Regions:
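ATP-binding glycine-rich loop module of kinase domains
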Residues: 34-36, 42-89
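Juxta-kinase regulatory segment immediately upstream of eukaryotic protein kinase catalytic domains
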Residues: 1-37, 71-72
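Helical subdomain adjoining the active site within ATP-dependent kinase catalytic cores
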Residues: 227-328
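Activation of the activation-loop gatekeeper triad in protein kinase-fold domains
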Residues: 175-180
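Conserved end of the kinase activation segment
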Residues: 202-212
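Catalytic-loop of the protein kinase fold
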Residues: 145-166
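Conserved activation segment of eukaryotic-like protein kinases, specifically the C-terminal portion
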Residues: 187-202
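Conserved structural core of kinase catalytic domains
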Residues: 87-133, 186
């Protein structure tokens, strides 16, 4: 695969390195300093790219080998087209679009999201003391995971850089290199994600893409947001921004003993969340974990809204008129 330096060179010299009109007629957008606008990706470089018609896309160029990348991308794209979701963005895989050292490589064009990553959003809310927004974020994340479970899919690499918060508070998932959809059953699990979001032992042992690879990440992310929404003093903005591979807690810091310090806090559902986290740590296989939505509903953190039963209409009968008619 091309190196990061080769890809940076290619994006600055599009006519020399790209072969498809969609890219040749577009342009890579730049930062205020004049550099290509680039987001880091686990196995790729992601550039903000404008097509000829003005549409802004995310141009993803792989820097690491993913086996059967084309087949994976097609399977994921087909699934999302048949199962529309507000949490994912549209994308297309274009074969043989990048030419470097005589070899052709595929590229991916995705809808561009202008949101900020989850960690930055939490920092903004804490600094502005907008705890209500954090509670909304926790609920929105719960709904996101509930939809993943409903579809029987997993993102595979849930972490703060891959979860973008839009201006209205809604969430978008990006970077689908580790994603599982039913058509990818039996494919290798090749991108394990940030250690700070993964089960300390079970994820490393996992061999194939599975619908349950997100379950540990879901719980650690939700637990963090939920705790901070109740106790914002936990969130040290400078400290968490320096920690690139975790959201707030290092997994090693949240062992069964240390996590107990939060159990007695008067926070709805927290003791049960802690108990399930401890159960997760005791497991050695990802298939033995449970989805976040199952645990949240067990804890009754968001009771179902019951619609009021409409009152029955009372029909008044004029008895006197009926009586008069009967007498006559």
């Amino acid at each position: 695969m091309p190196t990061s330096n080769q890809i940076d060179t290619a994006i600055k010299n599009i006519p020399q390195f790209f072969t498809v009109d969609k890219i040749l007629k577009g342009e890579c957008l730049k930062t205020k300093k004049g550099n290509p606008f680039c987001r880091p990706g686990g196995l790729c470089r992601v550039y903000k790219f404008q097509l000829e018609d003005g549409t802004v896309k995310a141009l993803r160029l792989w820097t690491d080998i993913i086996s059967e990348a084309k087949e994976r991308s097609i399977a994921i794209s087909d699934f999302l087209q048949n199962h529309p979701s507000k949490y994912f963005v549209n994308f297309e895989c274009i074969e043989n679009a990048l030419l470097i050292d005589g070899k052709k490589y595929p590229i991916v064009l995705m809808d561009w999201c202008d949101g900020i990553n989850m960690k930055s959003y939490i920092s903004q809310c804490v600094e502005a003391n907008e705890l209500g927004k954090l509670k909304d974020l926790a609920h929105e994340f719960y709904l996101l995971t509930k939809e993943l479970d409903k579809f029987g899919i997993s993102h595979g690499d849930l972490h703060h850089d891959n979860i973008l918060v839009q201006s209205d508070g809604s969430l978008r998932l990006i970077d689908y290199d580790s994603m599982y959809v039913p058509a990818l059953k039996g494919y290798k699990d090749e991108c394990m994600g940030y250690n700070g979001y993964q089960h300390p032992t079970a994820r490393e042992k996992n061999e194939f893409l599975q619908p349950y690879t997100d379950y540990f990440s879901e719980l650690i992310i939700y637990l963090t947001i939920y705790l901070v929404s109740e106790h914002p003093e936990l969130w040290d903005v400078e400290k968490v921004e320096e920690a690139e591979k975790e959201l707030l807690f290092k997994i090693s810091e949240l062992d069964p003993k240390t996590v107990n310090q939060y159990k007695d806090w008067n926070v709805k559902g927290l003791p049960l969340l802690i108990e399930w986290y401890k159960r997760f740590l005791s497991k050695s296989d990802l298939k033995d974990l449970k989805p976040l939505s199952f645990i949240i509903e067990l804890a009754n953190i968001y009771p179902p809204v019951v619609s009021p039963v409409p009152e029955k209409e009372t029909v008044k009968i004029d008895v006197s008129s009926i009586t008069e008619k009967w007498k006559s």
